[in-house]
Curated annotation (Swiss-Prot):
Any single Pfam family the record assigns to this protein: Oxidored_molyb
Name under which the protein is recorded: Protein-methionine-sulfoxide reductase catalytic subunit MsrP
Organism, as annotated: Shigella dysenteriae serotype 1 (strain Sd197)
InterPro entries: MsrP (IPR022867), OxRdtase_Mopterin-bd_dom (IPR000572), OxRdtase_Mopterin-bd_sf (IPR036374), TAT_signal (IPR006311)
HAMAP family: MsrP
Presence of keyword Metal-binding: yes
Amino acid sequence: MKKNQFLKESDITAESVFFMKRRQVLKALGISAAALSLPHAAHADLLSWFKGNDRPPAPAGKPLEFSKPAAWQNNLPLTPADKVSGYNNFYEFGLDKADPAANAGSLKTDTWTLKISGEVAKPLTLDHDDLTRRFPLEERIYRMRCVEAWSMVVPWIGFPLHKLLALAEPTSNAKYVAFETIYAPEQMPGLQDRFIGGGLKYPYVEGLRLDEAMHPLTLMTVGVYGKALPPQNGAPVRLIVPWKYGFKGIKSIVSIKLTREHPPTTWNLAAPDEYGFYANVNPHVDHPRWSQATERFIGSGGILDVQRQPTLLFNGYADQVASLYRGLDLRENF
């Protein structure tokens, strides 16, 4: 496995650009002007946080035992733990980047189970201990690219999804893998109020082709920065597909179902002209309302130090995954 390219940094990003995209998305989803005004104070709080004031705590989960295979270690500059845990999209807990860290503490994972079903010979139901006991954990330093044109580099901890799917023994009819997030309105304010939750249809669902799910880069993730995932990052287990935009990385997964048919996905249902099923990172295919040619890397500095850099095709993983899409029109199948 080739090591990843080093990311170069250039061109400072203005503060006004940093928060513009979210409001555009909400308007496209039909959220009212009154609702759009709700996160304004939170935006101000987040600006203060990026300047170094009142930062949320870094992940404080249980320490994990894991290896560090050389193939997944690299010289990429890491995004600090407090930013990984404090700057998130998890609309079930609110629309602003700071809302998940503020509100996700109510998420209870002690009775959590994950069901694997559908086109499999051996359906499974696993708890969190099963995941950490059955599969050796490893740290992988991955790029993470949001569709909103910002990026991080994160040391995730987990195991390849293909190892989990192999236990269930997919049948020859399995062509896709459908994922579903926990639906817990009593713990998730975004499920109680459509304005807090962005007007999306819940539970959040995502999907991959089976060959994408079986690729060795695709990671079932249970930790970050050496510890168990905090709730705002998708505890107890989330998906990481590093060559795709971040919204494909479904959080707090309770169901994995192998299917014959193309599964629905939340953002594609909400805005099919803007969010495709594949969602491969591609600097040559813009979002209808902003360019994807460059991205703002969130590193160790404050907001005035956030750097703009070129977006890499497949987020820098083209050597590993481009063959999955040979003959596929990436503009048509975005």
